[in-house]
Amino acid sequence: MAKGKDVRVTIILECTSCVRNDSKKELAGISRYITQKNRHNTPSRLELRKFCPYCYKHTIHGEIKK
């Protein structure tokens, strides 16, 4: 049986460059990835370098609140 809260939680990673450069109107949107993290191993917010199809380069994607 499971004890307490689930250890693995689903998180959303959002491109930090697209959020800051929102003034550009040619951008079609903001890149987001859905993944999971282990709450015990990574209690702080997760940041990963992922490919952003709107910036056309690898950028830092940070964890956002649901």
Curated annotation (Swiss-Prot):
The keyword Nuclease does not apply. GO terms for biological process: translation. The keyword Plastid applies. Gene3D superfamilies: Ribosomal protein L33. GO terms for cellular component: chloroplast; ribonucleoprotein complex; ribosome. SUPFAM superfamilies: Zn-binding ribosomal proteins (SSF57829). Its main location: plastid. It is found in: Plastid, Chloroplast. It comes from the Eukaryota. PROSITE patterns: RIBOSOMAL_L33 (PS00582). Keywords: Chloroplast, Plastid, Ribonucleoprotein, Ribosomal protein. InterPro entries: Ribosomal_bL33 (IPR001705), Ribosomal_bL33_CS (IPR018264), Ribosomal_bL33_sf (IPR038584), Ribosomal_zn-bd (IPR011332). GO terms for molecular function: structural constituent of ribosome. NCBIfam families: PRK00504.1, PRK00595.1, rpmG_bact. PANTHER family: 50S RIBOSOMAL PROTEIN L33, CHLOROPLASTIC, LARGE RIBOSOMAL SUBUNIT PROTEIN BL33C. Belongs to the bacterial ribosomal protein bL33 family. This is Large ribosomal subunit protein bL33c. It comes from Lobularia maritima.
